[in-house]
């Protein structure tokens, strides 16, 4: 590895993806969590520590209280976030951050004060030689080989629709809802409770998340699927719990992700659906660019990996778009890593060299330099 190889870190609400510029996939993918013992005696005799990070916190989740430093895409706890970055550099990537330029990702509409805080921590705590902060959706677009399009990015904590024209996001047309993967997991737990299964603790919710990721799909025609599930056992699947018990799941498999398309009807939430969000963002843009956006709708983020979501979104947008437009939804197979891959690609370009915020830039201008260099 060359001394100056860039570290690319995609900070998600649920999962951190980290690796090196120019590579096809992140080397480290782990939960963006910090775990602290519920009571100290619970961990006596184990290699007890006051806190655990990432995979280790996940493994010991039964006796830990789990904290997420990033909520709905925005960093809320900087002390814990610093610990996650420290873990990323020294444990996961095994590098010294003062020897590598770093690209960090951020949610669209990230508060200015947060961008400055990220910049300050990277230069002052980790002594990085250079930094760039990139909007997640723009990187997803690059990873799809486009510079114009609209990205529908649904992760664990937040869903955004971000129109991008010639590589620049259009901030006034960005839309967001606090409905994403974690909400789908909680909703699935609610549906399973109605079936007579109880999942309430943070450890049990991890089981529900696994059920959601392995068994859920989006119905192209929800009403027809619902009728079919009442008339037959077509959709029923078994799932084995960690204790060996088998549970059966049926219509919950498609009722859970329907929440993204009908938040009010499914769970009483007065939020825009993902099709409304996408349509609204496009309509907020100049009439001259709308056709390009309709023809390049890019899915990004782990929550868009649910089977059938691309076909359903296409159907919903076609119902709203002008009939003369050929709507296209692009759903790459490994889109949960689209943001990271875009960062890896971007930092590999020779033209990117002039875009870094260097240590000298930071020393001269302070953290506010991020607003000028990282647009």
UniProtKB/Swiss-Prot annotation:
GO terms for cellular component: cytoplasm; cytoskeleton. The keyword Magnesium does not apply. One of its GO terms (molecular function) is ATP binding. Pfam families: Actin. InterPro entries: Actin, Actin/actin-like_CS, Actin_CS, ATPase_NBD. It is found in: Cytoplasm, Cytoskeleton. It is an enzyme of class 3 (hydrolase). Transmembrane segments: none annotated. Its EC number is 3.6.4.-. SUPFAM superfamilies: Actin-like ATPase domain. Keywords: ATP-binding, Cytoplasm, Cytoskeleton, Hydrolase, Nucleotide-binding. The keyword Hydrolase applies. It catalyses: ATP + H2O = ADP + phosphate + H(+). Gene3D superfamilies: 3.30.420.40, Actin, Chain A, domain 4. Actins are highly conserved proteins that are involved in various types of cell motility and are ubiquitously expressed in all eukaryotic cells. Belongs to the actin family. This is Actin.
């Amino acid at each position: 590895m060359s001394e100056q190889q860039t570290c690319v870190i995609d900070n998600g609400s649920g999962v951190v993806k980290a690796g090196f510029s120019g590579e096809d996939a992140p080397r480290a993918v782990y939960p963006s969590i910090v775990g602290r013992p519920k009571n100290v005696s619970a961990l006596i005799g184990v290699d007890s520590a006051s806190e655990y990070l990432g995979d280790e916190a996940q493994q010991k989740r039964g006796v830990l209280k789990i904290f997420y430093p990033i909520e709905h895409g925005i960093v809320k706890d900087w002390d814990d976030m610093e610990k996650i970055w420290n873990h990323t550099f020294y444990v996961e990537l095994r590098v010294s951050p003062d020897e590598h330029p770093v690209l960090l990702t951020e949610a669209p509409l990230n508060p200015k004060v947060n961008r400055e805080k990220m910049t300050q921590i990277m230069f002052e705590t980790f002594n990085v030689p250079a930094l760039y902060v990139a909007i997640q959706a723009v990187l997803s677009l690059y990873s799809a080989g486009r510079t114009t399009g609209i990205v529908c990015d649904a992760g664990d904590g937040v869903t955004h629709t971000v129109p991008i024209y010639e590589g620049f996001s259009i901030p006034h047309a960005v839309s967001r809802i606090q409905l994403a993967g974690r909400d789908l997991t909680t909703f699935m737990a609610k549906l399973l409770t109605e079936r007579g299964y109880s999942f309430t603790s943070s450890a049990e919710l991890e089981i529900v998340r696994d059920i959601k990721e392995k068994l859920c799909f989006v119905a192209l025609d929800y009403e027809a699927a619902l009728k079919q599930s009442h008339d037959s056992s077509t959709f029923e699947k078994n799932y084995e719990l960690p204790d060996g018990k088998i549970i059966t799941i049926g219509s919950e498999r498609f009722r859970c992700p329907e929440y993204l398309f009908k938040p009010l009807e499914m769970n009483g939430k007065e939020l825009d659906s993902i099709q409304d969000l996408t349509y609204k963002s496009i309509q907020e843009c100049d009439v001259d660019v709308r056709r390009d956006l309709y023809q390049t709708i890019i899915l990004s983020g782990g929550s868009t990996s649910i089977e059938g979501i691309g076909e359903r979104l296409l159907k919903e947008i076609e119902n709203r778009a002008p009939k003369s437009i050929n709507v296209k939804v692009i759903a790459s197979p490994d889109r949960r890593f689209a943001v990271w891959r875009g960062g890896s690609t971007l930092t590999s370009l020779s033209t990117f060299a002039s875009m870094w915020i260097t240590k000298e830039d930071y020393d001269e201008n302070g953290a506010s330099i991020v607003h000028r260099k990282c647009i």
